[in-house]
């Protein structure tokens, strides 16, 4: 039993219940895969692409929207591939001998994952432990790209793609968040939203060099 208040790097008041309980959004822990010839997904569908040691795999948003986390092995490396539908962030990292699940909590409207070895909580966009025994520990990130299935399979024609045979009864052709993908609504509060001049869901890219000041009005607040 770990006291969250004693092992937290975040304000616990900002750790919110997302609705479903712990594991209420089930991770995929024994993923099955299709090929370009057998997948039901279309060329224009968005995927997360990962390639390690010559093995390429794609994880469709259609499936990730419902599960958010896939515990897999790619190129002989135990990996976890994650996606947060609320903030459109993708993060892949080495998982070692553990697996990760969906905690049911959100921080800054983003996925909070838990390590099944010791229940430590990790903020997905930063791949960092925020509560528990692994607080302040960072996960080893792996390259992952957001692209279309067409673009990915053109570059990696032998790539496998995550199957809809997940063991769960889900309609993987349906987006589960209604109009959220296209409207301006942010369901859960985030810091400094009143500073934004862009669309609330604008995708912002930035480069932050060590010892350089953070560009004014581009990024602010603690991590």
Task: Label every PLM stretch briefly.
Residues 1-223:
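Mid-to-C-terminal functional-domain signal that highlights helix-capping/loop sites
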């Amino acid at each position: 039993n770990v006291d969250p208040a004693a092992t937290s790097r975040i304000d616990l008041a900002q750790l919110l219940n997302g609705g479903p309980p712990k594991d209420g959004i089930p991770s995929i822990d024994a993923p099955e895969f299709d090929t370009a010839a057998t997948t039901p997904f279309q060329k224009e569908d968005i995927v997360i692409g990962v390639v390690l040691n010559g093995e390429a795999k794609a994880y469709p948003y259609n499936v990730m929207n419902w599960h958010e986390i896939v515990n897999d092995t790619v190129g002989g490396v135990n990996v976890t591939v994650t996606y947060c539908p609320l903030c459109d962030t993708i993060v892949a990292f080495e998982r070692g001998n553990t697996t990760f699940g969906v905690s049911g909590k959100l921080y800054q409207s983003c996925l909070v994952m838990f390590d099944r070895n010791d229940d430590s909580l990790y903020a997905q966009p930063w791949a960092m432990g925020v509560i528990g025994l692994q607080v302040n520990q960072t996960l080893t990130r792996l390259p992952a790209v957001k692209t279309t299935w067409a673009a990915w399979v053109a570059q990696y024609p032998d790539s496998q793609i995550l199957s809809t045979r997940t063991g769960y009864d889900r309609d993987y052709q349906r987006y589960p968040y209604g109009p959220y993908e296209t409207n301006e609504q942010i369901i859960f509060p985030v810091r400094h939203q009143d500073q934004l001049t862009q669309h609330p869901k604008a995708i912002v890219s930035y480069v932050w060099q060590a010892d350089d000041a953070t560009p004014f009005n581009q990024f602010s607040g603690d991590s």
